[in-house]
Amino acid sequence: IYENQTIKSIISNGPLGIDFISAGSSVVGLNNLNHKQIHFIVSAINELNSMYDFIIIDTGAGVSEQVMEFVAASNEIVLVTTPEPTSITDSYSLLKALYKRPDFDPSKVCIRVISNRAASKEDGSIVFNKINSVVMQFLNGSLEYLGYVPSDAMVEKAVRQQKILSIYDPTSKAARSFEEIAK
């Protein structure tokens, strides 16, 4: 999986003291991992717990077995969704699949929601309330709202420049929202 490298050897140092592991360079076949390989990666990541305050695994969208394994192994989940109906449906589908897993105990996991590309603060709250009400009604669970990230043209500009938005334009609406959510 890691081409015979340790997890510590494939860590890259990013700006502002944020380290990362790129799925593109050293991790082979990330989308085609079996159960044993995923558990190997989760164990390797757990070795890093003493080195970092937070370890974030960006699984991407969907309810694939790989996504579900990583999510189920987490003690905190941040679900990022958008106001589009398909995104809200996909978010609920992931949560429903998660709640059905025998290895998932909702009392031991904090699930938080960020509304991304929301038109306004109110729009972000509406998105959260839709998902949370369905989770409460059908899964007997509840979610925590972290906040919203407004739709912001600066995000696309930073992506095109391959820059971190908070460095590219720290005064942009989205960057200020990131900072607020991080608090």
Say what each PLM segment does.
Residues 1-50, 159-160:
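P-loop/Walker-type NTP enzyme "switch/lid" segment
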Residues 4, 8, 38, 42, ...:
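Amphipathic alpha-helical transducer elements in NTP-driven molecular machines
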Residues 114-116, 162-168:
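Short hinge/gating elements
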Residues 137-165, 178:
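Beta-strand-loop-alpha "switch" segments that mediate conformational coupling across diverse proteins
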Residues 50, 54, 59-147:
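Conserved catalytic-core segment of NTP-binding enzymes
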